[in-house]
Amino acid sequence: MDFYLDIVSVEKRIFSGLVDRIQVSGSEGEMGIYPGHTQLLSIIKPGVIYIFHKNKTEECLYISGGILEVQPSVVSILADVAIRGIDLDRKRVVKAKKQAEEYFKKETTNVKKDDVLLEISKAIAKLRVLEIMDKFKK
């Protein structure tokens, strides 16, 4: 069995096709979505989406957050930002993380620190996607 997955970011459609299952970080924790899953609407936290294709290959994407809608045969993900793992630039991600960490050390207001912590967590999630992609290559 399989289901149709549609992942759309603000900029463009990232993925559209039949899959065996997905794994995503929802507001209540990690969720595995399989064919015939109970209907569900959830907020997605920044992190990794694992896509398990029908041909037994795997793919992962970075997502900065969004909304997950599960219907019996269709799953839709509306993302703020979604980037395929193969499209991430490791050097840029590491540089952005270092800059955010340096800014965090300098910043004195809590409001700005919260924003910087969010940027750091997004960079960490992107690095996690890159690490997973490295494992796929082995």
Curated annotation (Swiss-Prot):
Q: Which GO terms describe its molecular function?
A: ATP binding; proton-transporting ATP synthase activity, rotational mechanism
| Matching Pfam families | ATP-synt_DE_N
Q: Which GO terms describe its cellular component?
A: plasma membrane; proton-transporting ATP synthase complex
Q: What topology does it adopt in the membrane? A: Peripheral membrane protein
Supply the CDD domains for this chain.
Answer: F1-ATPase_delta (cd12152)
So which domain of life are we looking at? Bacteria
* Cellular localization per UniProt: Cell membrane
Keyword list (alphabetical) reads:
ATP synthesis, Cell membrane, CF(1), Hydrogen ion transport, Ion transport, Membrane, Transport
Has keyword DNA damage? Answer: no
Q: What does this protein do?
A: Produces ATP from ADP in the presence of a proton gradient across the membrane.
Under NCBIfam families, the record lists: ATP_synt_epsi, PRK00571.1-4
To which protein family does this belong? Belongs to the ATPase epsilon chain family.
The record describes its quaternary structure and partners as: F-type ATPases have 2 components, CF(1) - the catalytic core - and CF(0) - the membrane proton channel. CF(1) has five subunits: alpha(3), beta(3), gamma(1), delta(1), epsilon(1). CF(0) has three main subunits: a, b and c.
Q: What is this protein called?
A: ATP synthase epsilon chain
The organism of origin for this protein: Buchnera aphidicola subsp. Schizaphis graminum (strain Sg)
